[in-house]
């Protein structure tokens, strides 16, 4: 991985014209140890797609990567995970990677702790500039600046989003979002859900497909929302919540109708 794999750095204060959407998911095996439930991380899944402000997109490419070992210390860092996903994506797509990246999961509070950066909950949140919004983690205050590459010389900006907050009120589950996309979440038995390690050992291909599908739904739903949001507001971004779309539309209406947003009355 080198600078030549990425788009040129964007001039300061210039508009973003393309994003890399990196949907991700983690699979765990829960076990009871000394009356405490511990979660062993089994795998990370990712799905990458580039979206541009002209409405064009790349293909959606996906994959799976395992931690280095069974212990917490063996988990990947956020940097390592992003590098693995981007490297594999670029091998398949042969395009320059945008430096503005949306990292998207469904219920980030479950998936973000899978990175070694988050071993210490408080320090991890501070390091990744995360805010707790409706009991999940997103980046509100500022982007997460990450330096990729062997020499840490490739600057990218990460924005963390949670599709749970971007889902319709009566369609909050990942399965619901998959149905909206026409991309069904794969079915799994209760026994396998409670013993993901057993499923992983017994049927690796299905285990991989099950996890990767979840990350693909996150990516494709995010792309769909960015396009919809741009069509409605002419702003090229993925909002924090579905509610913020309505707020922006109201402000847009006020602007177009010369109304004062402070009191809803005509401007004089």
Name each model feature, range by range.
Residues 1-26:
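N-terminal accessory regions of nucleic-acid-interacting proteins
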Residues 13-17, 38-42, 95-98:
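Intrinsically disordered, low-complexity regulatory regions enriched in Ser/Pro/Gly/Thr
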Residues 26-36:
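Short acidic, Gly/Ser-rich segments with clustered Asp/Glu that frequently serve as metal-coordination loops
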Residues 27, 49-51, 106:
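Structured beta-strand/turn binding interfaces of compact recognition modules in eukaryotic regulators
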